[in-house]
């Protein structure tokens, strides 16, 4: 993935790459910058790494992508589909409302400087989830030692 492709990877909640994958933020070779994708890439790899890769336009391999936080997992090419299927299986076991709320929780934590307000919002969120039909099903399934019955 190069340029905008790296931006797409950075937007993914879960990113799996094959060992053969190559990456590069090569816009500076053209006298340009990865400005449009920069918020997503910086959020994924951090400002220090972004400064290096934006400025040098150096290509990097999948292991480097994992080390800097662009991808979560690197697998042999012949295991890529199975690794993605495993992630989908794990996501399918999560409650849909809880999974969506987890994404919002991360956004809120990053965006909120007021920790007291964040603690209050988080307490309200978990209270809403506990009494929701999904929360009740999840807790009931846990107590009954069974798989939750929800649609994902």
Describe the residue ranges of each PLM region.
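Terminal low-complexity tails and localization/encapsulation signals of metabolic enzymes
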Residues: 140-152
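Hydrophobic, secondary-structure "cap" segments at the distal end of domains
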Residues: 39-48
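Short helix- or helix-capping micro-motifs
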Residues: 49-58
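Glycine-rich phosphate-binding loop at the start of an alpha helix
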Residues: 3, 35, 59, 136
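Acidic, divalent-metal-coordinating active-site segment for phosphoryl/phosphodiester hydrolysis
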Residues: 58-64
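C-terminal long alpha-helix characteristic of the crotonase
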Residues: 16-21, 71-120, 127, 133, ...
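Glycine-rich beta-to-alpha active-site loop
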Residues: 1-30
